[in-house]
Amino acid sequence: KRRLYERLEYEATHDSLSGLLNRESFVRFRNDLMRGGRNVSCGIVAGDINDLKQLNRDYGQSSGDTTIKEAASVMVSSFAGASIFRLSGDEFIIVSLESAYEEFMERVGKMEWLLDSRTPNGVSLGCTWEEHLADFDRLMRHAEELMLVNKQIYYKDSSQERKHYSPEYLNRLLQDMEEGCYRLCLQPKYNPL
């Protein structure tokens, strides 16, 4: 009976695909934080997977699901101990309480690099940090606004190179090369001048 209750509680608070906390958990977390009036440092990262709908259309739903799971895995490994939520299909929020600014920004930088290398189109991020959390909603809006700016930059720059370049596929190719799946040959060039 206890296991059943625990399973139901988990299913009610977690996203079934990513294993992250869900939107309902975020609402409860936010309300508890606002009620508690905690005077702690707070870093927030808002993330949105780039071109997830296009990925689903071009390669099928399973490709999009794999991308969501990979992004979630990177977030969890990058922000162990933080509260990580999947708010909707391609939107994520990370809330890191009581972390130093330098540590928070270092984690964001490493996570961004990993997300760019492990997902087909990367994830647009916006992050904010406050030493003494005064207004969670304001800090959250700020992170979301910065994410939207980065999303627009992605779409502006994605017309040619980003459309055809994927770090995920490059990493697979390099791995296949290391495993001997390809034979590399040097083609000499001749310049009569």
Where are these regions (language model features)?
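Catalytic-core segments of nucleotide cyclases and related cyclic-nucleotide turnover enzymes
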Residues: 61, 105-116, 125-156, 170, ...
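Conserved long alpha-helical elements within nucleotide-processing catalytic cores of c-di-GMP signaling
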Residues: 9-13, 19-43, 50-77, 85-94, ...
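Interdomain signal-transducing alpha-helical coiled-coil linkers
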Residues: 1-11, 23, 163-170
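Hydrophobic pocket-lining residues within nucleotide cofactor-binding pockets
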Residues: 49, 99, 130, 189-192
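PAS/PAS-like sensory domains
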Residues: 40, 120-122, 179-185
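Active-site core of bacterial EAL-family cyclic-dinucleotide phosphodiesterase domains
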Residues: 160-193
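Conserved acidic
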Residues: 1, 48-51
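GGDEF/GGEEF active-site signature
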Residues: 44, 70-133
